[in-house]
């Protein structure tokens, strides 16, 4: 029987398989690594396309308007290469709801996101894989994730604190920086059994900060009883403001 990720490594080292031979056995050409690279390439290509679409359909000041809403102030300068764009960029493209009146052209018939409007108008431009990825980004809201375990250079075992779901997130750079019990505000999407960050806040939260998230969870449960994906999309402003 093949060893599970959390089982003792068959080599007899005494440590978990995922932190021993599992990492060594994963080559750059294995299916998971190939899929991870493909998803990241699609993410970068779609972000550029959606940004062009937004500039054309919403005007050049949509970046400033998005920044004002995201940070709650107009004093934060926009720099597309800044760490803050790790959170602002994906939220702006996939999660920010745009009023119908703001669209100059190619807008949806009702309030929607930049990505959902693009899918309505230009889905035929995308190959099937890119379309599924974009649909996953539109469907999934940002949430707070707590790091439970880390495999440096590979990924992180994480719990969605608000929905109570556990996922193994393939993330090479963040897995080298985050520690167990830290938390991140992130946009984790799932495609073909792989989970990865499509966006995250630039600053990790420490364990003491979890108290505020627990208070947010209690508030959400009081309003909705069950915290679902739809609830998190609807309460985006409250979650983001925590």
Predicted regions and their residues:
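Acidic/negatively charged segments and metal-coordination signatures
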Residues: 1-157, 161-242
């Amino acid at each position: 029987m093949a060893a599970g990720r959390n089982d003792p490594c068959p080599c007899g080292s005494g440590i978990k398989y995922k932190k021993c031979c599992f990492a060594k056995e994963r080559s750059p050409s294995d299916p998971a690594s190939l899929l991870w690279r493909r998803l990241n390439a699609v993410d970068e290509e779609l972000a550029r396309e959606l940004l062009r679409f937004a500039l054309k359909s919403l005007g050049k000041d949509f970046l400033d308007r998005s920044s004002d809403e995201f940070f709650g102030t107009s004093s934060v300068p926009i720099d597309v290469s800044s760490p803050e764009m790790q959170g602002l960029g994906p939220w702006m493209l996939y999660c920010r709801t745009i009023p119908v009146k703001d669209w100059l052209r190619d807008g949806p018939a009702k309030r929607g996101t930049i990505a959902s409007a693009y899918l309505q108008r230009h889905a035929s431009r995308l190959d099937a894989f890119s379309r599924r990825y974009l649909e996953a980004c539109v469907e999934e809201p940002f949430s707070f994730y707590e790091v439970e375990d880390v495999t440096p250079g590979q990924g992180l075992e994480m719990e969605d604190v608000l929905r109570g779901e556990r996922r193994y997130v393939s993330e090479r750079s963040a897995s080298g920086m985050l520690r167990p019990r830290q938390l991140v505000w992130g946009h984790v999407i799932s495609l073909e059994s792989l989970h990865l960050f499509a966006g995250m806040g630039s600053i990790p939260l420490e364990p003491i900060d979890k108290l505020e998230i627990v208070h947010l969870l209690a508030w959400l449960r009081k309003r909705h009883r069950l915290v679902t994906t739809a609830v998190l999309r609807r309460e985006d402003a409250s979650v983001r403001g925590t």
